[in-house]
């Protein structure tokens, strides 16, 4: 018969005699070799309400044996809620799963937590049964063999080492997924980061590390952990490795910038050179200039005697309106006619698109985007310089980082200065291109200029091809008519 049954029998006896309840039985002593010797027995349950109450209080329980640990429970084994726990002070028989909250250390005046501290507010929360909580939220399954019939002790399974989770469950899970893709130990991973070694880790992995840098709250939680760090989960251990490095998130961002720097600079330089080449090719094409003059003459001929006549030039977007004016039979546009005249009188101008080989590529580049990338690169380099300065006073762990960063900066700063100079030159060339066609660069940006020119080239080439097909078609039709006429004459002569 266990202690709880003894207590129930005692209570029933007290009810029947209407006297004060007897003292609870002393705890049973267990041999030192027993499997239960390390866990003290629970204290007696509070007595139930008696049918006939007396003024005599129940005697205190007898003193515990000197070898028992019930007199000095540790904070790791006893639930310490201030109220609302049934059997407060009961010994926990198992580790419980944590509730990943962010606790407040101070009740702000006027908050509900301050109100809850009042004695009259404490009773509003329901009572919690410790045994039920242990049953539902135990971190490991409780062994049923330790409390089987008659106190018989069965063979206990070897306890599994349970990992301690301090980080919110979903975040820890996602972090461990990320870490599963990194095939090197965590200390070696951080050593590669501090060495700025791009052969071990790529930019995507570095960016993922940045996403999982511990927050201020998580850092405080980990720093406050006083248990065995070997029992922490992989996410927590990863966070601890990160926290060993001063300003770890800034260093990771510097590493990410370094990895991407050369490819970004190469792309920027390629785009700027394409724009520079396109502007020089367009402005240097004498064939395009003569075609523009031919269009001006054609337009003045059509608009003679009207307000549109006697023009000294035209806006660039007027090039695309050459297809709007059609012949009386609607079979030919003004663009077709321009191509026809050039083919007959100035055939050497028809291949003017070959003078502007960079034009099409330039239409795929946004000068505004290049400006934003250029600014981002400059600001990124400024942050690298700031971290380089800050790492001078770091501990030994940042020594290699500082040394490798110095080598990178010696190259990167020169690259950015060269790029800034090229950008300034290209910006001036882009504005000059709009001015070349008599446009205001503020109203007609570079992108609009090259887009209009490329569309004009495309329509011009298509119209010339259509003219050539039409000429070939008419030539074949004339030959066929001539053959038919010849056949008719032959039949007539025979008759």
Swiss-Prot record:
Residues 1-92 are annotated as: Disordered. Residues 30-39 have a biased composition (Low complexity). InterPro entries: FH2_Formin (IPR015425), FH2_Formin_sf (IPR042201), Formin_homology_domain (IPR051144). It comes from the Eukaryota. Residues 19-29 have a biased composition (Pro residues). PROSITE patterns: FH2 (PS51444). It holds the Pfam family FH2. Residues 86-486 form the FH2 domain. Belongs to the formin-like family. Class-II subfamily. This is Formin-like protein 17. The gene is FH17.
């Amino acid at each position: 018969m266990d202690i709880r049954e003894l207590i129930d029998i005692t209570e029933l006896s007290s009810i029947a005699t209407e006297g004060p309840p007897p003292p609870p039985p002393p705890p049973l002593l267990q041999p030192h070799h027993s499997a239960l010797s390390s866990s003290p027995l629970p204290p007696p349950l509070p007595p139930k309400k008696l049918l006939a109450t007396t003024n005599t209080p129940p005697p205190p329980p007898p003193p515990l044996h000197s070898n028992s640990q019930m007199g000095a429970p540790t904070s790791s084994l006893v639930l310490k809620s201030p109220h609302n726990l049934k059997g407060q002070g009961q010994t926990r028989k198992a580790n419980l799963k944590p509730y990943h909250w962010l606790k407040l250390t101070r009740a702000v005046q006027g908050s509900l937590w301050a109100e809850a501290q009042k004695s009259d507010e404490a009773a509003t929360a329901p009572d919690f049964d410790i045994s039920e909580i242990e049953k539902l939220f135990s971190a490991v399954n409780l062994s049923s063999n330790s409390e089987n019939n008659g106190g018989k002790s069965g063979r206990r399974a070897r306890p599994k080492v349970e990992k301690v989770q301090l980080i919110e469950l979903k975040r820890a899970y996602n972090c461990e997924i990320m870490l599963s893709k990194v095939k090197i130990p965590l200390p070696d991973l951080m050593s590669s980061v501090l060495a700025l070694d791009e052969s071990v880790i790529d930019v995507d992995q570095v960016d993922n590390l940045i996403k999982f840098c511990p927050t201020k709250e998580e850092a405080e939680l980990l720093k406050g952990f006083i248990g065995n760090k070997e029992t922490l989960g992989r996410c927590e251990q990863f966070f601890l490795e990160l926290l060993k490095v001063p300003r770890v998130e800034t260093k990771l961002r510097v590493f990410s910038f370094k990895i991407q720097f050369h490819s970004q600079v190469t792309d920027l330089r390629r785009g700027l050179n394409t724009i520079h080449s396109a502007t020089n090719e367009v402005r240097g094409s004498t064939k395009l200039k003569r075609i523009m003059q031919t269009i001006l003459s054609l337009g003045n001929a059509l608009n003679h005697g009207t307000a549109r006549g006697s023009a000294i030039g035209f806006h660039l977007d007027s090039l695309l309106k050459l297809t709007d004016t059609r012949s009386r039979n609607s079979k030919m546009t003004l663009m077709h006619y321009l191509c026809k005249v050039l083919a007959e009188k100035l055939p050497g101008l028809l291949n003017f698109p070959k003078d502007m080989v960079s034009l099409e590529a330039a239409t795929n580049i946004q000068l505004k985007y290049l400006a934003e990338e250029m600014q981002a690169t400059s600001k990124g380099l400024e942050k690298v310089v700031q971290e380089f300065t800050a790492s001078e006073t770091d501990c030994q762990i940042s020594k290699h980082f500082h040394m490798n960063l110095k080598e990178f900066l010696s190259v990167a700063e020169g690259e950015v200065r060269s790029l800034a100079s090229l950008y300034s030159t290209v910006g001036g060339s882009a504005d000059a291109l709009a001015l070349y066609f008599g446009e205001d660069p503020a109203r007609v940006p570079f992108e609009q200029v090259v887009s209009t020119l490329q569309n004009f080239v495309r329509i011009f080439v298509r119209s010339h091809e259509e003219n050539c097909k039409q000429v070939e078609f008419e030539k074949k039709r004339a030959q066929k008519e001539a053959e038919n006429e010849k056949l008719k004459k032959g039949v007539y002569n025979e008759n």
